[in-house]
Swiss-Prot record:
A zinc finger (MYND-type) spans 52-90. It catalyses: L-lysyl(4)-[histone H3] + 3 S-adenosyl-L-methionine = N(6),N(6),N(6)-trimethyl-L-lysyl(4)-[histone H3] + 3 S-adenosyl-L-homocysteine + 3 H(+); L-lysyl-[protein] + S-adenosyl-L-methionine = N(6)-methyl-L-lysyl-[protein] + S-adenosyl-L-homocysteine + H(+). Its main location: cytoplasm. This is N-lysine methyltransferase SMYD2-A. One of its GO terms (cellular component) is cytosol. Its EC number is 2.1.1.-, 2.1.1.354. S-adenosyl-L-methionine binds at K17, G18, R19, H137, N206, H207, Y258, F259, F260. InterPro entries: H3K4_H4K5_MeTrfase (IPR050869), SET_dom (IPR001214), SET_dom_sf (IPR046341), TPR-like_helical_dom_sf (IPR011990), Znf_MYND (IPR002893).
Amino acid sequence: MKKEGIEGTERFLSPGKGRGLKAIKHFKVGDLVFACPAYAYVLTVNERGGRCECCFTRKEGLSKCGKCKQAYYCNVECQRGDWPMHKLECSAMCAYGENWCPSETVRLVARIILKQKHQTERTPSERVLTLRELEAHLDKLDNEKNEMNDTDIAALHHFYSRHLDFPDNAALTELIAQVNCNGFTIEDEELSHLGSALFPDVALMNHSCSPNVIVTYKGTVAEVRAVQEINPEEEIFNSYIDLLYPTEDRIERLKDSYFFNCDCKECTSKSKDEAKMEIRQKLSIPPEEEEIKQMVIYARNVIEEFRRAKHYKTPSELLEICELSMEKMGAIFAETNVYMLHMMYQAMGVCLYMQDWDGAMKYGEKIIHPYSVHYPPYSLNVASMYLKLGRLYLGLEKRTQGVKALKKALAIMDIAHGKDHPYIDEIKKEMEEQT
């Protein structure tokens, strides 16, 4: 395939940012700017049996691979379509049994290596940026990241050496770094993790904390839609990170994961920081600066502690961490403070896992309004929270509230996902069943 570009857009040199993507025509809110099929992708292990490995369709009665009995497909066409990639893992899963445990990154890298062997021309995923052009930032990796890369290389050799010829370690290190810096997480309508993929053309877009496009997924295809008016010659910006947090946290996260300092209008104006860091009103003695600073340090530490604890603590222990941390932070922070909201969101997730629907609903009700204030318009985080709440209400037979919440989710998803997205049809069906 020859280099053909993406209609309505153009690759260019963005001042101070390097290469980027700009509009050469007008896009209105909700317009599809472009779609990009995955160069390579992998369904996460936890979704096996519920979704097709090839097209990610969620449905009952999928057929499983007769050999490994672990991969599931819609039909023979999907199974055949996935076989070149699945054969990398099929016999290995049979041989290793429960000891077959490569990380998702390793699985994705193995598929990329296989594709590179057979694919010599540009693919439809590389109309404006090829995989080989992706940034790796090897010179900026610290010891911890280098060690993780070495672990991934060892796992590649361990699990895939029978079916793959590997490039040398230097090339492998670069490829893994490219995937870590440019890979995408495919998520469903509730932002649950479905898999990992590489979309080179989507990776060309630079970051802004006030993005004018949003990326959603239709199966294994990424769709980029305008969430602000975009005029000709304006740069097209995506967001690489969760935008809930204050400027200092966002800058730190972008520096750590993507190796650049963000100077977007949101980071220079810090216009939302005061609301995001809301302090409790009506305290008899307002907290001093140092107290607030110490509480922020505590909040960041507890967020990291909880992230690690998810791997080994029980749900009730996790809920206790959430409740104790909210109690401590609540002495200074308002309930609308993003660190409080973070722990409420985690607590809601634990309640959902434990099937404590009332508990999940109570947290969701506290979260939804501040989310709508803190996030930019047409945020998937806000849409998914309305969806979760709507479905909780319906499950608890609060029909009116349920339908109202689902309608609010749909208003965002019509723009972010496009009116013809299968998720929208599913939600409309859920609403029709209530009439």
